[in-house]
Amino acid sequence: MKIYAFDVDDTLEVSGGPISIVSVGRLKPQGHIVGLNGNWAVVVQTVPLWHRIFSFVGPMEMSKDTFLNQLKTYIPADDYIMVGNIKGVSGASDDEGAANLAGWRFIKESDFAAGAR
């Protein structure tokens, strides 16, 4: 089982990114845990039945890397994957940096949209 944490802005289609909610939704039936590590309010306000796709939303009152550390500490998995932006290259947030600080594997949003898992 893998845990996927998705940034929202410039990552998911609901906020200007290339990744469809449908493609994210395909991960859960494969046995993976899927959640948000970004502007989660956009998703819960625009995606009907968002709670059937996403098992966690955050970060709340903490940095992205701290949130990832909390998830990794308490939820055992075979792989931990942050999907999002490279600051200054594909978006404004440093999701790659947060993933590196937390010891998570990183997938750039356009690579995920192209099929990288």
Task: Give short role names for the model-derived ranges.
Residues P59-D65, D111-A114:
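Short, acidic/turn-prone active-site loops that include or flank metal/cofactor-
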Residues I86-W104:
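Acidic, divalent-metal-coordinating active-site segment for phosphoryl/phosphodiester hydrolysis
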Residues A92-D95, S110-R117:
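Short glycine/proline-centered loop/turn elements that form peptide/ligand docking sites
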Residues K2-S63:
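Alpha-helical substrate-recognition element adjacent to the catalytic core
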Residues L36-G38, V83-G84, S110:
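Short beta-strand/turn micro-motifs composed of small residues
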Residues G103-D111:
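Short, basic interhelical loop/turn and adjoining N-cap
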Residues K64-A92:
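Conserved Lys-Pro-Asp/Glu-containing loop-to-beta segment of HAD-superfamily phosphomonoesterases
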Residues H32-I33, D79, R105:
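Residues at the starts of beta-strands that form the adenosine-phosphate
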